[in-house]
Amino acid sequence: MNRTKTMRLLTPLVLAVALAASPALAARDWAVPDTGIIGVEQAQLDPAFWVGQQSQPDRVILDTAAIAAQNERLHRLDRSIHDLKALPSTLTREQVSGWVSALSKAPTKPLFDEHGQPVARDALAAVVANANLDAIADGATTRYGLVVHRADLRAFPTTLRVFSSNDDHDIDRFQESGLFPGDPVAVVHESHDGQWWFVVSPRYAAWIEKRFVAVGDAERVLGFGERAPYRVVTGAKAFTLFTPEEPRVSELQLDMGTRVPVLADWPTGKPVNGQHAYTSAVIELPVRNNDGSLAFAPALLPRREPSEDHYLALTPRHLIEQGFKFLGERYGWGHSYNGRDCSGFVSEIYRSMGVELPRNTSDQAVSPALNRIALSDKDSPARRLQIARELQVGDLVYIPGHVMMVIGQIDGEPYVIHDTTGLSFTGADGKTVRAKTNGVTVSPLTPLLFNGKQTYVDRMTNIQRIRP
């Protein structure tokens, strides 16, 4: 997840991409058109442009059976994935302490608040103490819950936002990830103030505010995501209808890839929360009772909202179109800002096609369950460029801290879509140009600079291909 400062060019530039560190990258004239982004014309901001580049845009890359096998392999081989069904009925203190301690480590470097002021040591000490490590019991019963509202996952049980420098206000170091309505969790520990739970979800273990989780029996919790018939959200976001009768499911946001069961036997003509259902799908959502227990309530998902009664087929067309549904969305580190970061972005795209991925770039990049090309310092610039020019739609390109998804090639130049804080490239005057995109962005790959001496291609660490 790279960081850049802003600088926008309004006139064409010739970019020097034949860096001394990358002799294999042939010199090429790059212009900065009226988009202000290197090599990107207005037409290339339309998914139809990239779909039109494909000779077989509707070719099925992996069918339903192959995707199921891929997901099974992920759960079996990838240690970052948690199998909630395999958890024992009681948990040892060692197991729970291991989860919490791995994440909630006392900060050792200065941190700053939203106003750029240093966070006091006693304030940080109170945050660490609220993790309540000494209270972890041995043999506690494993409890399960469903998330009832999009919610943050945090490194500590606090809403305090902290930053590594006094001029950074976006990368909250206590923000880890996010969960969506219907996501299952195992509840394994409670904060000292009683307002937070430490939960284990299939892809991440972290702190979540209690008010976003409803606790129920394992069968109902773990079976919720397997119920049929169902709807899958295929837009960036979908919303249930407003209802004053049941505020818990009113205008509830459902993000791309969220799967919710349909109440197919709902009687025709019977109102749902005071409204006829013929213009909507009647879905069922988890809700939290006042005592924190799990219940379910019907809700209306309008036909106008983007959803399907099946996962989308894994095709080049769908990969491109799903990625572009986020185009321009504000970058949100760890799913903050009601958005997502680079790894969350690619995860949601693939989730809408039924494909599961690890949460973070560090785990995605090396997952043994995927079709991986590993790169090292021993790989020459020529080999790196060759690999880049062989990339296909949907391939995931990893550099330290960042991931991009390939959307096509133009004259041997790979283009990517990615959720990034900014882009850097070299101008005709030899100076670095920085564009603070701070959102989902389209760009060519090879002219992007990682630092003053290396390009993104130089720093590629892994390619992951969700294909045969």
Question: Which residues does each PLM region occupy?
Answer:
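Gram-negative bacterial Sec-dependent N-terminal signal peptides
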Residues: 6-24
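Boundary regions of SH3-family modules and the immediately adjacent low-complexity/disordered segments
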Residues: 27-154, 160-164, 170, 186, ...
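Aromatic- and glycine-rich peptidoglycan recognition patches
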Residues: 28-40, 47, 203, 211-232, ...
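Soluble non-cytosolic domains of exported or imported proteins
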Residues: 144-147, 173-179, 248-251, 310-317, ...
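Second-shell loop/turn segments in exported
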Residues: 169-172, 244-247, 305-310, 328-337, ...
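...with weaker cross-activation on analogous glycine-rich loops/strands in unrelated enzymes
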Residues: 178, 358-427
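Loop/turn positions that initiate beta-strands
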Residues: 180-185, 255-263, 393-397
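Active-site nucleophilic cysteine motif
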Residues: 333-353, 357-364
